Amino acid sequence: MLPLVCRTHEKPVAVSMKKMLLLVASVLLAVAVTAGCATLDAKQREWIFQPSNQSWGGAQSTSDMQDVWMDFDSQETGQSARLHGLWLAQPRADAPVLLYLHGARWNVSGSSARIRRMHALGFSVLAIDYRGFGQSSAGLPSEAMATEDAHAAWRWLAQQQPQAPRYIFGHSLGGAIAVNLASEVDDERGTMVEGTFTSMADLVGSFQWGWLPVSGLITQRFESVRKVARIGSPLLVVHGSNDSLVNARLGRQLYEAAQQPKRFVLVEGGSHHNTNAVGSPLYREAVASLFQLR
């Protein structure tokens, strides 16, 4: 039987995510054989992004954040698109600004606590929902669409804050989107990623059932390790030592593939979801020294 080659249009609990990835790995072959590449691609996009309008927090968690909207014409879908974002500004007009890119499953308001911690470091923060999440345009997200969404938000920041230095932050899956964006723009002052990975194939392969032969069937590849060397700004890679979803080894490998200046911070006791909180003092010191922000 000839190998199946799939081509795409493209260019929060850890346990449930692991179950999802196990489902991806165990079902990919069956879906590919019985339903073909289009269904395989769609199922992967559902499993990886888990798009939702659900959040960990309620309206109160974002009550002091401003709703903002970004409209653009999507080259990926050929349709008009609208992104919803949350804007948390600093009192200082010249404060650095940060584009916050969240991970899978929950909408942007589920990241409100992490948004506030980044704000406490001195950034004005724009956090967006990709299409398919929250109040952004409906649709099934993909790697290409999420990258396009990140670019749209980056342009919005440039238009709204033309004098401010701009930075990129991504958590988990958002870290892969952040690396992709940073590798394609040349006006970022720095990039931060937390709890992220080298590639989707490496992530699937890092689990105990990673021997399953599914790498060639992955359409949403998120190959950050191939892109990170193209980032021309300082890179901060943060990982929790107790991250049971994305092994810290993958974060270290991503860091090693990047150019200088860069820094790797391992937060002892940090999990996939609390590293940002547990490691707040380390974040503050690393941001100050690597990006020379006070």
Model regions and ranges:
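Alpha/beta-hydrolase fold nucleophile elbow
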Residues: 161-172
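An N-terminal hydrophobic leader/cap segment in hydrolases
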Residues: 32-74
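Short beta-strand/loop motif that positions the catalytic acidic residue
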Residues: 231-232, 237-239, 243
